[in-house]
Amino acid sequence: MSMVLGAEPAQAPERVLTTAGWLSLEHEYVPRVVAGEHLHAHPEAKAALAIAARTFVLRAMRDRPTLGRTTPIPSGEGFQVFARGASEECVIAASVTQGIVLRYQGRMILANHVAGAYWKPDGSLGSDPTNTERWVTYNLGRRGGDVIPTGLSLRSHPGNRGCLGQHCANWLAAQGYDHRTILRFFYGDDVELHELASRERTGLVGRALWGVLALAIIGITMRR
């Protein structure tokens, strides 16, 4: 069976069609996925999840031209869950990573993500109530053909560069890892963070400064 791989988008859509109607990609859909998947995560884990969620849906739309346009994007464990609303922290996570997707060799990856097992304070694995730890991959330090694909998708798919574990990402963030390092922890050292063009762009420098400040404020608040 041949794979259908669409043309790589240069620009992110402003809106996407979902089972909840038309939503702004950056201001509604991505924040609501972060809320639906891991509402109470550390800010850096939320930022990592926002990038993974954005990549996941845009890659799916790339290869299924009707998805998000005439075919509604679903919400559920078979795709990714989006909540009815989003907290301010989830909105910020989407805002500071606006337009950023994960790529390998110039193509968006699948960017699978699951809950995975909880992690204990000492860094050992805890319980796995969702039975999804089996899909999580640990690819820190790996590149190219050494990156472990996830069994959640076809292993031979060129975009299969592993799977993020949300609880592990939260633990990593609590240890001081930033969202870029968290993403490479699961998807490999050679994963590319690429910014798509957008009519809503506020500028890299301004957004970066706002992002650092916002994440720092939330992080300080969470530690109190």
Regions picked out by a protein language model, each given a short descriptive name:
Residues M1-G211:
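Conserved, single-site charged/polar hotspot
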Residues G206-R223:
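Terminal signal-anchor or tail-anchor transmembrane helices
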